[in-house]
Regions:
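General marker for long, soluble alpha-helical cores
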Residues: 1-182
Length: 182
């Protein structure tokens, strides 16, 4: 549905979540991986249909396709701002997971065999920060009124890993500014 009729994807996803809430995270991951352009609509539909499923679905989307993070965060923040903090936390948990960065590096090396080890190291070093910035931007776009609160929540989550936190301050601020420049 997401590929053939993207405009209807959100409505269909909402109905699917209501019919089978246990499949929401798997559906979200599949869409993020295969039809990233529909990630925002699907994420918003899941959050609207059952806000309690939003964080798990957001984490699954982040794992499946980090490039869909901003759209997914925006969709969820717009549909259910009351769970935006949980959503951001779940997405940041994935972004900050060293195993996830390792998987990202392996996939990048396979897809780009001409990368030097230094270039690959730089990609991995920037991966988590870029992902966190995308999450922040998505949250701010989804609901500019919660941007300030979300920045604080995201910084608290970043402090769970103080070694990485210093890199996230600028990414969170930059993402929020890009998403809600007012």
């Amino acid at each position: 549905v997401a590929q053939m009729a993207p405009g209807a994807a959100g409505d269909v996803a909402g109905a699917m979540v209501e019919a089978n809430p246990d499949g929401a995270a798997e559906m979200a991951a599949t869409v993020a991986e295969n039809v990233p352009g529909a990630a925002g609509a699907i994420a918003g539909a899941i959050a609207e249909a059952d806000p309690a499923l939003a964080a798990e679905a957001a984490g699954a989307m982040m794992e499946a396709n980090p490039a869909a993070a901003s759209a997914a965060a925006a969709g969820m923040a717009n549909a259910a701002p009351e769970v935006a903090g949980d959503v951001a936390g779940a997405m940041m948990e994935v972004a900050m997971d060293p195993e996830f960065a390792t998987d990202f590096a392996e996939n990048a090396a396979t897809a780009n065999p001409d990368l030097t080890p230094d270039q690959l190291d730089a990609l991995v070093d920037n991966f988590a920060g870029n992902a966190v910035g995308a999450i922040a931007q998505g949250m701010a776009v989804g609901d500019p009124d919660i941007a300030g609160d979300m920045a604080g929540i995201m910084m608290d989550a970043a402090m769970a890993n103080p070694d990485m936190a210093e890199n996230f301050v600028g990414e969170i601020a930059g993402g929020m500014a890009a998403g809600a420049p007012q």
